[in-house]
């Protein structure tokens, strides 16, 4: 079998950031898939499953309720490697286009107080797998170290 494009990416040189992973053309529309990379692959500890699950719930809720973008949001979900998330939006975007939206999203997560949306047994397939304090910690770290100081190497995959 052929290696899929995401496995051809040089993960050794990959930094934390926001990257366009792919663009799919469906009918007359483009769906842009973003790699929201929160950890450097194979060089730092991955995100714990509980905090990544909480980030998923909070980011998906925030984005699907966003007054400007809610109709363009297709999907937000964790990567199996636990180094970040995939984010799909309807439209033809580059990473820089969504940097302000990601800053807003991660500030929302960092500042969130109260019960995490969708964490009741009837709402979630693993409602006990959550960690709000660690999700807030990881959101703050990603904001401070990556999103708020992003350069081209955090917005474009390495060649």
Swiss-Prot record:
Residues given in the record as Fe cation binding sites: 53, 57, 124
What reaction does this catalyse? S-(5-deoxy-D-ribos-5-yl)-L-homocysteine = (S)-4,5-dihydroxypentane-2,3-dione + L-homocysteine
Instruction: Identify the cofactor(s).
Output: Fe cation
- Cited SUPFAM superfamilies: LuxS/MPP-like metallohydrolase
Q: Give EC number(s), comma-separated.
A: 4.4.1.21
What superkingdom heads the lineage?
A: Bacteria
Biological role: Involved in the synthesis of autoinducer 2 (AI-2) which is secreted by bacteria and is used to communicate both the cell density and the metabolic potential of the environment. The regulation of gene expression in response to changes in cell density is called quorum sensing. Catalyzes the transformation of S-ribosylhomocysteine (RHC) to homocysteine (HC) and 4,5-dihydroxy-2,3-pentadione (DPD).
UniProt subunit comment = Homodimer.
| The name this protein goes by in its record | S-ribosylhomocysteine lyase
Organism, scientific name: Porphyromonas gingivalis (strain ATCC 33277 / DSM 20709 / CIP 103683 / JCM 12257 / NCTC 11834 / 2561)
């Amino acid at each position: 079998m052929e290696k899929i494009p995401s496995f051809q990416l040089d993960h050794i040189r990959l930094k934390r950031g926001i990257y366009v992973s792919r663009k799919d053309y469906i009918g007359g529309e483009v769906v842009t898939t973003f790699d929201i990379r929160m950890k450097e692959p194979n060089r730092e500890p991955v995100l714990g499953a509980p905090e990544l699950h909480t980030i998923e719930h909070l980011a998906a809720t925030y984005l699907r309720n966003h007054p400007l973008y809610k109709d363009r949001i297709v999907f937000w979900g964790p990567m199996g490697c636990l180094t970040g998330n995939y984010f799909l939006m309807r439209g033809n975007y580059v990473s820089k286009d969504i940097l302000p939206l990601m800053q807003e999203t991660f500030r929302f997560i960092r500042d969130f107080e109260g019960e995490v949306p969708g964490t009741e047994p009837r709402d979630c397939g693993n409602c006990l797998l959550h960690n709000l304090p660690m999700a807030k910690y990881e959101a703050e770290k990603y904001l401070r170290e990556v999103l708020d100081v992003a350069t081209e190497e955090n917005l474009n995959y390495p060649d």
